[in-house]
Amino acid sequence: MTIRYPNGKRYNQASQPHKTPIKKHTYSNRGMSLEEELNETNEYYLTHNIACVHKKPTPLQIVKVDYPARSAAVVKEAYFKQPSTTDYNGVYKGKYIDFEAKETKNKTSFPLQNFHLHQIEHMKQVIAHNGIAFVIIKFTLFDELYLLDAKHIITFWNRQNTGGRKSITKEEIVEHGSLLSCGYHPRIDYIRVLDTVYFS
């Protein structure tokens, strides 16, 4: 399927390297992506009346559809209607929460090129309206997850724009962020960290 941006440029998904390092999987996360783990976590929170958080749909304009059978439709070409903001939003303890989920195979840093300007602007707007904005970053080689408040992401973004580093070091993420615990239910208990960081 061909997907295009509003300006007509083709969207090319980053290709995955052919050789990937062998990763130890625990029984709690075998074969799951960060997005799948968060979706399952949010389902748990919703079912247990803890929080109401959902994945935002990507706004697409479908251009070409093939119908190989009467009961099946295959989308062949689509455009992004508008730039997406962040991955998830919802409500917890009466506060609006909004966050992005990112993974990296880097060992020592997280590249800021994984963010787009419109995402940074969106997080600024959430903060300006007294909402809670943050990023969940997964270092896949270590199977470590951190919750980092958006104000730090914005600071590092501004540093890059004034000639500084184009990445956030893992040490900076450890210093300013919070390590997330992983388990069975919920898989990624980010609400526990929200309680500590924003509600204590």
Curated annotation (Swiss-Prot):
Organism: Bacillus anthracis
Lineage of the organism: Bacteria, Bacillati, Bacillota, Bacilli, Bacillales
Signal sequence range: none
Catalytic reaction equation(s): Endonucleolytic cleavage at a junction such as a reciprocal single-stranded crossover between two homologous DNA duplexes (Holliday junction)
Entry protein name: Holliday junction resolvase RecU
Record Gene3D superfamilies: 3.40.1350.10
Coiled coil (residue ranges): none
Function description: Endonuclease that resolves Holliday junction intermediates in genetic recombination. Cleaves mobile four-strand junctions by introducing symmetrical nicks in paired strands. Promotes annealing of linear ssDNA with homologous dsDNA. Required for DNA repair, homologous recombination and chromosome segregation.
Pfam families for this protein: RecU
Enzyme Commission no: 3.1.21.10
Assigned keywords, A-Z: Cytoplasm, DNA damage, DNA recombination, DNA repair, Endonuclease, Hydrolase, Magnesium, Metal-binding, Nuclease
UniProt-annotated location(s): Cytoplasm
Keyword Amino-acid biosynthesis: no
Cofactors: Mg(2+)
Any single Gene Ontology cellular-component annotation: cytoplasm
Taxonomic superkingdom: Bacteria
Top EC class for this record: hydrolase
Site feature (Transition state stabilizer) residues: K102
Chief location: cytoplasm
Keyword Oxidoreductase: no
